Amino acid sequence: MNSTEPDSDRVTRTDRLNAPEIADVQALARAAGDADGADPFDEHTLLRLRDPHAPTHHLTARTANGTLTGYAHLDITNPTSGTGVELAVHPAYRRRGTGRALARSVRAAVTGPLRAWAHGDHPSAAALAVDLDYRRARVLWQLRRPLTAPIPEPPLPDGVTLRAYRPGADDDAWLALNAKAFADHPEQGQWTAADLQARRDEPWFDAAGFLLAVDPAGQLLGFHWTKIHERPGSARIGEVYVLGVDPTAHGGGLGKALTAAGLAYLRDQRGLDRVMLYVDESNTAAVALYERLGFARWSAHVNYQLG
């Protein structure tokens, strides 16, 4: 463990957090999300926060009395291609130099390229990125749609049927299809059995809402994995969590049919009235598909790179 001393708070780096420290970070994330309208850490980061074996560095900023004022998460799974970074400062302790101190500590802790996410694309994050020579490299859109509006009912391709995912029995086939469908995706396509199991262990997991498209021989051709977000004080919202189609099945309308089937499940079986999804700005085909299905842009999440 080592530390640096910024102007206001003490920034400390460690490879593992204990239970009280994890609780502090989770509370900070909730406060920042409530204040900013966008959660500062994605699901991947929150899962690794609790995993003592994850290849991760943690940077915490605290006042002299030990109050957590800021946190930065460094994912060092593949430092050659770039260390992943997510950072947040507690709303009550902003404009004190904490964010800049954490960002500088991140640079001091890493020798290779950096890939930092700014969820919500806030002006302060953009200004800090410019000051520290990061370049805007990638944008994810969050799109939303009311489920009270009519949902299209496009037909499935001939011979294709839908069924629910079977935990354990479908794992290998789904992982293979996921890797194939997201071969060019920097995160999703690299999922392992451990990544799948980690999501299955989460309270939100619902096998009935994990829809698989199969051909007459039982081979997986596509999937729509739905998720429901529940947060105290907020209305529930569904998510098109992961949607994938085998490249050999592209062009037959399977993606549209899977999307519609998942939306109908969230509305009819789970009683939801709204849904969201994330899509890369550069994936113009997917953006066009979702817009035709009634989705509209809600917020942006920006990836900044250095080195």
UniProtKB/Swiss-Prot annotation:
GO biological process: mycothiol biosynthetic process
Superkingdom per UniProt: Bacteria
CDD domains named among the record's database cross-references: NAT_SF
Signal peptide location: none
Species this protein is from: Salinispora tropica (strain ATCC BAA-916 / DSM 44818 / JCM 13857 / NBRC 105044 / CNB-440)
Gene3D superfamilies referenced in this protein's UniProt entry, alphabetically: 3.40.630.30
Keywords: Acyltransferase, Repeat, Transferase
Residue ranges of domain N-acetyltransferase in the record: 12-157, 160-307
Official protein name in the record: Mycothiol acetyltransferase
Residue positions binding acetyl-CoA 2: L243, G244, V245, H250, G251, G252, G253, L254, G255, K256
UniProt keyword Transmembrane present: no
Annotated HAMAP family: MshD
Record-listed 1D-myo-inositol 2-(L-cysteinylamino)-2-deoxy-alpha-D-glucopyranoside binding positions: E43, E187, K227, E239, Y278
